[in-house]
Amino acid sequence: SPQXETKASVGFKAGVKDYKLTYYTPDYKTKDTDILAAFRVTPQPGVPPEEAGAAVAAESSTGTWTTVWTDGLTSLDRYKGRCYHIEPVAGEENHFIAYVAYPLDLFEEGSVTNMFTSIVGNVFGFKALRALRLEDLRIPPAYSKTFQGPPHGIQVERDKLNKYGRPLLGCTIKPKLGLSAKNYGRAVYECLRGGLDFTKDDENVNSQPFMRWRDRFVFCAEAIYKAQAETGEIKGHYLNATAGTCEEMIKRAVFARELGVPIIMHDYLTGGFTANTSLAHYCRDNGLLLHIHRAMHAVIDRQKNHGIHFRVLAKALRMSGGDHIHSGTVVGKLEGERDITLGFVDLLRDDFIAKDRSRGIYFTQDWVSLPGVLPVASGGIHVWHMPALTEIFGDDSVLQFGGGTLGHPWGNAPGAVANRVALEACVQARNEGRDLAREGNEIIREASKWSPELAAACEVWKEIKFEFQAVDTL
């Protein structure tokens, strides 16, 4: 049979063969242990979709461009990737979704790096394809169980911080570059003192001439302890441990642990998955929370027909390890994007996510008991967005207002107060059964009557129109 082409009796036929003879298997039944991938394929003109899909399966598993005699020394049937289904994308000419199944044995256990090297390592430069995008991955429990996952997860984080029943509040310290360590620490203290739970190093604050990392760590730790003492709440500052080498990164993490701070931070795409997984292991062993920033993600995920969708990068992060990850804000975006963002927010938080193509989820994903990751909404949000954010993200999230805190006309601490008051008002209104989508502006206005800080913030940013009226259509 053409399927079992590895028997010696067949003889060795040299030459270039169509990929689809070996790698396109529409009658294949996927196994529970297979890693499944959904690729959006745009073939070059004249290349049939089956051949393109099979080429993806081949190039990302056992195939090479010609038949080689060493194929006879292994069982291709056991190790090859298989393109088992192809469907056209509605409304797009010459776009197809190719589903590929990879046998589990092709991957090293506990290595996101190896998983990506195999699945997306070579195939994106393939000539027969005009463009290729990895839309989704199904990680089988047999594989996800080989990963530690997030250092702590959502529940343990709440227990460590003693904060329940509401989203957490953060703020990125700006200007991101140029402050001295002492002034930086002062800004941190003011925000935490005003009522935020966290402040954050910007992703590109590492260790520059104007502020070396040790100085920053020391001044921020001082700010944290001072704010904790004055407010009676646990506070944190995401100290960015990202560095040029893994050794230096771990050195910074060790110093943070010695200072006794609760949380550090890493840029997982620029730092790389290997570094990130090492850091996540260190964080779990030493009781540090790990905040993940996705700097560079748009380079990879912005094109709709080429690259890797962010939901795949988010799944990979949950396996590699991180307690928070930035995931977009949803507010003021289009409906469709909103559903898709909520799709990967669920992939980060929940144990079991059912297949739902309307939210961009191509496969049912069962994480078994891997801890969840808190999604972080950050970027261009302010107090008027608070009802929408509370409604959309729910309690298990971190809402980060950078300019929305530091841009307050009276300063950082009042800006923090305004955000905290707005958040508490929204949470209370929700718990009393009010509809945040419809009454959001009203709730904020009521709260601003007894909080001058909030009133000032409302005045600066004015009301915004919520672009969603009907939340129930989801």
Swiss-Prot record:
UniProt cross-references to InterPro entries, sorted A to Z: RuBisCO, RuBisCo_large_chain_AS, RuBisCO_lsu_C, RuBisCO_lsu_C_sf, RuBisCO_lsu_fd_N, RuBisCO_lsu_N_sf, RuBisCO_lsuI
Binding site for substrate: 122, 172, 176, 294, 326, 378
UniProt KW Lyase keyword: yes
GO terms of molecular function: magnesium ion binding; monooxygenase activity; ribulose-bisphosphate carboxylase activity
Keywords, ordered alphabetically: Calvin cycle, Carbon dioxide fixation, Chloroplast, Disulfide bond, Lyase, Magnesium, Metal-binding, Methylation, Monooxygenase, Oxidoreductase, Photorespiration, Photosynthesis, Plastid
Entry binding sites for Mg(2+): 200, 202-203
Positions of post-translational N6,N6,N6-trimethyllysine modification: 13
Keyword Chloroplast: yes
Marked site: Transition state stabilizer: 333
Reaction(s) the record says it catalyses: 2 (2R)-3-phosphoglycerate + 2 H(+) = D-ribulose 1,5-bisphosphate + CO2 + H2O; D-ribulose 1,5-bisphosphate + O2 = 2-phosphoglycolate + (2R)-3-phosphoglycerate + 2 H(+)
Role of this protein: RuBisCO catalyzes two reactions: the carboxylation of D-ribulose 1,5-bisphosphate, the primary event in carbon dioxide fixation, as well as the oxidative fragmentation of the pentose substrate in the photorespiration process. Both reactions occur simultaneously and in competition at the same active site.
Cited PANTHER family: RIBULOSE BISPHOSPHATE CARBOXYLASE (PTHR42704), RIBULOSE BISPHOSPHATE CARBOXYLASE LARGE CHAIN (PTHR42704:SF15)
Record's protein name: Ribulose bisphosphate carboxylase large chain
Higher taxonomy: Eukaryota, Viridiplantae, Streptophyta, Embryophyta, Tracheophyta
